[in-house]
Protein backbone atom coordinates (compact mmCIF):
# COMPACT_ATOMS: atom_id res chain seq x y z
CA UNK A 1 0.00 0.00 0.00
CA UNK A 2 2.83 2.38 0.89
CA UNK A 3 4.58 1.54 -2.36
CA UNK A 4 1.37 2.18 -4.29
CA UNK A 5 1.03 5.70 -2.86
CA UNK A 6 4.68 6.40 -3.57
CA UNK A 7 4.24 5.48 -7.24
CA UNK A 8 1.18 7.67 -7.78
CA UNK A 9 1.95 11.13 -9.38
CA UNK A 10 1.57 14.13 -7.04
CA UNK A 11 -1.35 16.26 -8.23
CA UNK A 12 -0.12 19.66 -9.51
CA UNK A 13 -1.94 22.97 -9.10
CA UNK A 14 -4.84 23.67 -11.44
CA UNK A 15 -4.10 25.61 -14.63
CA UNK A 16 -6.26 28.53 -13.50
CA UNK A 17 -4.33 28.78 -10.24
CA UNK A 18 -1.04 29.07 -12.16
CA UNK A 19 -2.46 31.87 -14.27
CA UNK A 20 -3.65 33.71 -11.17
CA UNK A 21 -0.22 33.47 -9.54
CA UNK A 22 1.48 34.72 -12.72
CA UNK A 23 -0.94 37.64 -13.00
CA UNK A 24 -0.38 38.66 -9.37
CA UNK A 25 3.39 38.52 -9.79
CA UNK A 26 3.27 40.58 -12.99
CA UNK A 27 0.99 43.15 -11.40
CA UNK A 28 3.35 43.41 -8.45
CA UNK A 29 6.35 43.99 -10.71
CA UNK A 30 4.50 46.62 -12.76
CA UNK A 31 3.34 48.38 -9.62
CA UNK A 32 6.87 48.33 -8.23
CA UNK A 33 8.31 49.81 -11.44
CA UNK A 34 5.69 52.54 -11.56
CA UNK A 35 6.28 53.41 -7.94
CA UNK A 36 10.02 53.78 -8.33
CA UNK A 37 9.77 55.90 -11.49
CA UNK A 38 7.32 58.45 -10.11
CA UNK A 39 9.15 61.38 -8.49
CA UNK A 40 8.76 62.17 -4.81
CA UNK A 41 5.93 64.67 -4.09
CA UNK A 42 4.37 63.90 -7.48
CA UNK A 43 1.48 61.72 -8.53
CA UNK A 44 1.67 59.58 -11.66
CA UNK A 45 -1.30 58.03 -13.40
CA UNK A 46 -2.16 57.24 -17.00
CA UNK A 47 0.96 59.00 -18.34
CA UNK A 48 0.09 62.16 -16.37
CA UNK A 49 2.70 63.41 -13.89
CA UNK A 50 1.38 66.06 -11.50
CA UNK A 51 3.99 67.87 -9.39
CA UNK A 52 2.02 71.09 -8.94
CA UNK A 53 1.64 73.01 -5.67
CA UNK A 54 4.55 71.26 -3.97
CA UNK A 55 6.80 74.30 -3.30
CA UNK A 56 9.51 72.78 -5.47
CA UNK A 57 12.65 74.84 -6.04
CA UNK A 58 13.89 72.59 -8.84
CA UNK A 59 12.40 70.22 -11.38
CA UNK A 60 12.15 66.53 -10.38
CA UNK A 61 15.17 64.66 -11.77
CA UNK A 62 13.46 61.50 -13.05
CA UNK A 63 10.09 61.04 -14.71
CA UNK A 64 8.37 58.03 -16.25
CA UNK A 65 9.70 57.67 -19.77
CA UNK A 66 6.20 57.61 -21.29
CA UNK A 67 5.04 60.87 -19.64
CA UNK A 68 2.57 62.74 -21.83
CA UNK A 69 1.30 65.42 -19.47
CA UNK A 70 3.69 67.10 -17.02
CA UNK A 71 2.49 69.74 -14.57
CA UNK A 72 5.08 71.70 -12.57
CA UNK A 73 2.73 74.62 -11.97
CA UNK A 74 2.52 76.74 -8.82
CA UNK A 75 6.00 76.03 -7.51
CA UNK A 76 9.17 78.08 -6.99
CA UNK A 77 11.26 76.68 -9.81
CA UNK A 78 13.87 79.21 -10.96
CA UNK A 79 15.62 77.20 -13.68
CA UNK A 80 15.21 74.19 -15.94
CA UNK A 81 18.45 72.30 -16.66
CA UNK A 82 19.59 71.93 -20.30
CA UNK A 83 18.40 68.74 -21.93
CA UNK A 84 15.74 68.14 -19.28
CA UNK A 85 13.14 67.02 -21.82
CA UNK A 86 15.48 64.95 -23.99
CA UNK A 87 14.25 61.54 -22.84
CA UNK A 88 10.52 62.26 -22.79
CA UNK A 89 9.62 61.82 -26.44
CA UNK A 90 5.91 61.30 -25.71
CA UNK A 91 5.43 64.64 -23.92
CA UNK A 92 2.32 66.49 -25.19
CA UNK A 93 1.55 69.00 -22.42
CA UNK A 94 4.01 70.98 -20.27
CA UNK A 95 2.67 73.30 -17.57
CA UNK A 96 5.27 75.58 -15.95
CA UNK A 97 2.98 78.45 -14.97
CA UNK A 98 3.38 80.43 -11.78
CA UNK A 99 7.05 79.75 -11.09
CA UNK A 100 10.17 81.95 -10.91
CA UNK A 101 11.67 81.27 -14.33
CA UNK A 102 13.77 84.13 -15.74
CA UNK A 103 14.95 82.26 -18.84
CA UNK A 104 14.97 78.83 -20.43
CA UNK A 105 18.10 77.01 -21.62
CA UNK A 106 18.79 76.92 -25.37
CA UNK A 107 17.50 73.80 -27.07
CA UNK A 108 15.16 72.81 -24.24
CA UNK A 109 12.45 71.77 -26.71
CA UNK A 110 14.84 70.31 -29.27
CA UNK A 111 13.54 66.76 -28.76
CA UNK A 112 9.98 67.68 -27.76
CA UNK A 113 8.65 67.11 -31.23
CA UNK A 114 5.20 66.06 -29.99
CA UNK A 115 4.73 68.89 -27.51
CA UNK A 116 1.43 70.61 -28.29
CA UNK A 117 0.55 72.74 -25.24
CA UNK A 118 3.07 74.89 -23.36
CA UNK A 119 2.18 77.18 -20.45
CA UNK A 120 4.90 79.60 -19.27
CA UNK A 121 2.57 82.21 -17.81
CA UNK A 122 3.11 83.98 -14.49
CA UNK A 123 6.91 83.79 -14.55
CA UNK A 124 9.75 86.33 -14.79
CA UNK A 125 10.87 85.77 -18.37
CA UNK A 126 12.57 88.86 -19.82
CA UNK A 127 12.84 87.88 -23.48
CA UNK A 128 11.92 85.22 -26.00
CA UNK A 129 15.12 84.47 -27.95
CA UNK A 130 15.47 83.26 -31.52
CA UNK A 131 14.69 79.58 -32.06
CA UNK A 132 13.47 79.19 -28.48
CA UNK A 133 10.94 76.64 -29.71
CA UNK A 134 13.24 75.11 -32.31
CA UNK A 135 12.08 71.69 -33.53
CA UNK A 136 8.91 71.87 -31.42
CA UNK A 137 6.89 72.05 -34.61
CA UNK A 138 3.86 70.38 -33.04
CA UNK A 139 3.09 73.30 -30.72
CA UNK A 140 -0.54 74.40 -30.96
CA UNK A 141 -0.84 76.59 -27.86
CA UNK A 142 1.77 78.83 -26.17
CA UNK A 143 0.93 80.94 -23.12
CA UNK A 144 3.52 83.61 -22.24
CA UNK A 145 1.09 85.92 -20.46
CA UNK A 146 1.72 87.68 -17.15
CA UNK A 147 5.48 87.86 -17.52
CA UNK A 148 5.86 91.50 -16.37
CA UNK A 149 9.56 91.69 -17.31
CA UNK A 150 9.04 90.42 -20.85
CA UNK A 151 10.49 93.25 -22.96
CA UNK A 152 11.51 91.62 -26.22
CA UNK A 153 10.33 88.90 -28.56
CA UNK A 154 12.94 88.05 -31.18
CA UNK A 155 11.66 88.25 -34.78
CA UNK A 156 12.50 84.55 -35.21
CA UNK A 157 11.23 83.37 -31.82
CA UNK A 158 8.31 81.40 -33.31
CA UNK A 159 9.99 80.38 -36.53
CA UNK A 160 8.70 77.09 -37.94
CA UNK A 161 5.62 76.80 -35.71
CA UNK A 162 3.24 76.26 -38.60
CA UNK A 163 0.62 74.54 -36.42
CA UNK A 164 0.46 77.22 -33.73
CA UNK A 165 -3.15 78.37 -33.25
CA UNK A 166 -3.16 80.20 -29.91
CA UNK A 167 -0.50 82.65 -28.72
CA UNK A 168 -0.92 84.65 -25.52
CA UNK A 169 1.48 87.58 -25.00
CA UNK A 170 -0.82 89.61 -22.75
CA UNK A 171 0.13 91.46 -19.57
CA UNK A 172 3.85 91.66 -20.17
CA UNK A 173 6.25 94.54 -20.67
CA UNK A 174 6.16 94.65 -24.47
CA UNK A 175 6.34 98.09 -26.08
CA UNK A 176 6.98 96.73 -29.57
CA UNK A 177 6.41 93.49 -31.45
CA UNK A 178 8.01 92.77 -34.79
CA UNK A 179 5.69 91.78 -37.60
CA UNK A 180 8.27 89.18 -38.61
CA UNK A 181 7.61 87.31 -35.36
CA UNK A 182 3.98 86.67 -36.39
CA UNK A 183 3.73 86.60 -40.15
CA UNK A 184 5.34 83.16 -40.29
CA UNK A 185 2.44 81.64 -38.33
CA UNK A 186 -0.12 80.59 -40.98
CA UNK A 187 -2.34 78.72 -38.52
CA UNK A 188 -2.61 81.48 -35.92
CA UNK A 189 -6.23 81.99 -34.83
CA UNK A 190 -6.07 83.63 -31.41
CA UNK A 191 -3.57 86.32 -30.43
CA UNK A 192 -3.72 88.02 -27.02
CA UNK A 193 -1.62 91.20 -26.68
CA UNK A 194 -3.57 93.34 -24.19
CA UNK A 195 -2.10 94.74 -21.01
CA UNK A 196 1.27 95.71 -22.54
CA UNK A 197 2.79 99.24 -22.61
CA UNK A 198 2.62 99.59 -26.40
CA UNK A 199 4.39 102.54 -28.01
CA UNK A 200 2.15 103.34 -30.96
CA UNK A 201 4.72 105.07 -33.15
CA UNK A 202 5.57 104.51 -36.78
CA UNK A 203 7.11 101.10 -36.01
CA UNK A 204 3.73 99.80 -34.84
CA UNK A 205 1.95 100.46 -38.15
CA UNK A 206 3.04 97.25 -39.98
CA UNK A 207 1.77 95.06 -37.13
CA UNK A 208 -1.59 96.83 -36.93
CA UNK A 209 -2.05 96.65 -40.69
CA UNK A 210 -1.31 92.93 -40.62
CA UNK A 211 -3.79 92.34 -37.80
CA UNK A 212 -6.53 94.25 -39.62
CA UNK A 213 -6.04 92.15 -42.73
CA UNK A 214 -6.35 88.98 -40.64
CA UNK A 215 -9.17 90.13 -38.37
CA UNK A 216 -11.44 87.34 -39.64
CA UNK A 217 -8.86 84.72 -38.72
CA UNK A 218 -7.03 86.33 -35.83
CA UNK A 219 -8.94 87.37 -32.74
CA UNK A 220 -7.10 89.94 -30.64
CA UNK A 221 -8.13 91.31 -27.25
CA UNK A 222 -8.76 94.75 -28.70
CA UNK A 223 -10.49 96.09 -25.60
CA UNK A 224 -7.39 95.60 -23.44
CA UNK A 225 -4.69 96.68 -25.90
CA UNK A 226 -3.90 100.36 -25.30
CA UNK A 227 -1.17 102.78 -26.32
CA UNK A 228 1.23 103.92 -23.61
CA UNK A 229 2.82 106.48 -25.93
CA UNK A 230 3.54 108.80 -27.71
CA UNK A 231 1.73 111.42 -25.59
CA UNK A 232 -0.73 112.36 -28.35
CA UNK A 233 -2.22 108.83 -28.41
CA UNK A 234 -1.63 107.78 -24.80
CA UNK A 235 -4.56 105.73 -23.50
CA UNK A 236 -6.05 105.23 -26.96
CA UNK A 237 -7.14 101.69 -27.86
CA UNK A 238 -4.50 100.15 -30.07
CA UNK A 239 -7.00 99.07 -32.69
CA UNK A 240 -8.64 102.49 -32.87
CA UNK A 241 -5.62 103.81 -34.76
CA UNK A 242 -6.18 104.23 -38.48
CA UNK A 243 -4.00 105.01 -41.47
CA UNK A 244 -4.64 108.68 -40.72
CA UNK A 245 -2.95 108.18 -37.34
CA UNK A 246 0.27 107.27 -39.13
CA UNK A 247 0.03 109.93 -41.82
CA UNK A 248 3.10 111.71 -40.50
CA UNK A 249 5.10 108.52 -41.04
CA UNK A 250 4.56 108.77 -44.79
CA UNK A 251 5.18 112.44 -45.51
CA UNK A 252 6.55 112.82 -49.04
CA UNK A 253 7.76 115.95 -50.84
CA UNK A 254 6.16 117.04 -54.11
CA UNK A 255 7.81 119.04 -56.89
CA UNK A 256 6.29 122.23 -55.49
CA UNK A 257 7.82 121.40 -52.10
CA UNK A 258 11.25 120.98 -53.63
CA UNK A 259 10.88 124.23 -55.58
CA UNK A 260 9.82 126.07 -52.44
CA UNK A 261 12.79 124.68 -50.51
CA UNK A 262 15.13 125.70 -53.35
CA UNK A 263 13.63 129.18 -53.43
CA UNK A 264 13.96 129.59 -49.67
CA UNK A 265 17.54 128.40 -49.87
CA UNK A 266 18.30 130.89 -52.64
CA UNK A 267 16.72 133.77 -50.70
CA UNK A 268 18.63 132.82 -47.56
CA UNK A 269 21.87 132.70 -49.55
CA UNK A 270 21.25 136.15 -51.10
CA UNK A 271 20.33 137.55 -47.70
CA UNK A 272 23.50 136.11 -46.23
CA UNK A 273 25.66 137.61 -48.98
CA UNK A 274 23.94 140.99 -48.66
CA UNK A 275 24.34 140.95 -44.89
CA UNK A 276 28.03 140.15 -45.15
CA UNK A 277 28.46 142.90 -47.76
CA UNK A 278 26.77 145.49 -45.55
CA UNK A 279 28.77 144.40 -42.54
CA UNK A 280 31.95 144.73 -44.58
CA UNK A 281 31.07 148.24 -45.73
CA UNK A 282 30.11 149.24 -42.21
CA UNK A 283 33.38 147.92 -40.81
CA UNK A 284 35.36 149.73 -43.52
CA UNK A 285 33.57 153.02 -42.87
CA UNK A 286 34.15 152.71 -39.14
CA UNK A 287 37.82 152.06 -39.76
CA UNK A 288 38.18 155.14 -42.01
CA UNK A 289 36.24 157.33 -39.59
CA UNK A 290 38.45 156.22 -36.71
CA UNK A 291 41.61 156.88 -38.73
CA UNK A 292 40.39 160.37 -39.76
CA UNK A 293 39.73 161.28 -36.13
CA UNK A 294 43.22 160.23 -35.16
CA UNK A 295 44.76 162.45 -37.90
CA UNK A 296 42.71 165.49 -36.80
CA UNK A 297 43.89 165.10 -33.22
CA UNK A 298 47.52 165.13 -34.38
Curated annotation (Swiss-Prot):
The chain crosses the membrane at residues 259-279. PANTHER family: GH08155P, LEUCINE-RICH REPEAT-CONTAINING PROTEIN 55. GO terms for biological process: monoatomic ion transmembrane transport. One of its GO terms (cellular component) is plasma membrane. Residues 1-34 form the signal peptide. Keywords: Cell membrane, Disulfide bond, Ion channel, Ion transport, Leucine-rich repeat, Membrane, Repeat, Signal, Transmembrane, Transmembrane helix, Transport. Auxiliary protein of the large-conductance, voltage and calcium-activated potassium channel (BK alpha). Modulates gating properties by producing a marked shift in the BK channel's voltage dependence of activation in the hyperpolarizing direction, and in the absence of calcium. Disulfide bonds join 38-44, 42-51, 200-227, 202-249. Residues 35-65 form the LRRNT domain. It is a single-pass membrane protein. It comes from the Eukaryota. This is Leucine-rich repeat-containing protein 55. Residues 196-251 form the LRRCT domain. Interacts with KCNMA1. LRR repeats lie at residues 66-87, 90-111, 114-135, 138-160, 163-186.
Amino acid sequence: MGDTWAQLPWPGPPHSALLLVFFLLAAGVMHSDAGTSCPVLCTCRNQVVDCSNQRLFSVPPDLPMDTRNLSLAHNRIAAVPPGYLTCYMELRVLDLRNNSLMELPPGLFLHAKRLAHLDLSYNNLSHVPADMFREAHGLVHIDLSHNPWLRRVHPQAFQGLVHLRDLDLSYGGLAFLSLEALEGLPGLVTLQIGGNPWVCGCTMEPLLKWLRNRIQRCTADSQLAECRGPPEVEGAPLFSLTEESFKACHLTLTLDDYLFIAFVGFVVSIASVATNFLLGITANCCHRWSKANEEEEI
